């Protein structure tokens, strides 16, 4: 954790107006484990060093069977939810995500949305909790799942339906973000007419989804 504390303090000193939106729940859990800390202690120290908000990375699909199939090394459903709840109790704003289109079934997508909604409902009054929800399509290029015969099957209409369902179910989360980086600008623009109210940010550099086949 010392590395991140020093990094965050240096960034805040050099760029006082910058807001640090960094480290998802898996990273927080990993830092806590290798530092001999609880995740709550880890979050407190990172916030003291300058962390402003936590991205929703690593949520994938919040279902134990799905996670065992696609990301067995990542924290469990319970761990992801626990880190986010701790962040909320400390007043740290977060976002939530859903990566769909691999081995999950429609009911597991719905269960994922309900888990996010229920966690937001537990956010202490006056704390920001989840500020946004961002669903995106699984990109298969170069992944282990592709080698097992599971490839990207992107449908713009399905994405629009997921955006609409997210807006209806997540009535306690203020913003639904269209992931233009993974679905393309045209689909993201259509999503703005279907429940999304956020297009996210312009990225200076991105290597994760581009390496998996996204070319937006």
Locations of regions flagged by a protein language model:
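Auxiliary Fe-S-binding modules of radical SAM enzymes
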Residues: 14, 35, 113-114, 121-216
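Conserved Radical SAM active-site core
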Residues: 1-118
């Amino acid at each position: 954790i010392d590395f991140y504390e020093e990094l965050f303090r240096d960034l805040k000193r050099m760029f006082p107006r910058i807001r640090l939106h960094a480290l998802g729940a898996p990273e927080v859990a990993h830092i806590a484990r290798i530092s001999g800390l609880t995740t709550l202690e880890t979050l407190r120290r990172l916030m003291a060093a300058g962390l402003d908000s936590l991205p929703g990375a690593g949520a994938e699909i919040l279902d134990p069977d799905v996670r065992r199939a696609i990301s067995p090394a990542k924290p469990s459903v319970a761990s992801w939810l626990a880190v986010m709840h701790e962040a909320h109790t400390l007043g740290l704003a977060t976002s939530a995500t859903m990566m769909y289109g691999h081995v999950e079934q429609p009911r597991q997508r719905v269960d994922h949305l309900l888990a996010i909604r229920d966690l937001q409902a537990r956010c202490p009054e006056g704390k920001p909790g989840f500020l946004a929800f961002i669903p995106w399509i699984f990109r298969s290029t170069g992944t282990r799942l592709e080698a097992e015969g599971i490839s990207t099957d992107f449908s713009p209409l399905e994405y629009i339906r997921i955006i609409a369902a997210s807006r209806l179910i997540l009535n306690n989360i203020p913003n639904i973000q269209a992931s233009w980086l993974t679905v393309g600008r045209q689909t993201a623009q259509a999503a703005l007419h279907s429940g999304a109210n956020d297009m996210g940010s312009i990225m200076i550099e991105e290597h994760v989804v581009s390496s998996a086949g996204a070319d937006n």
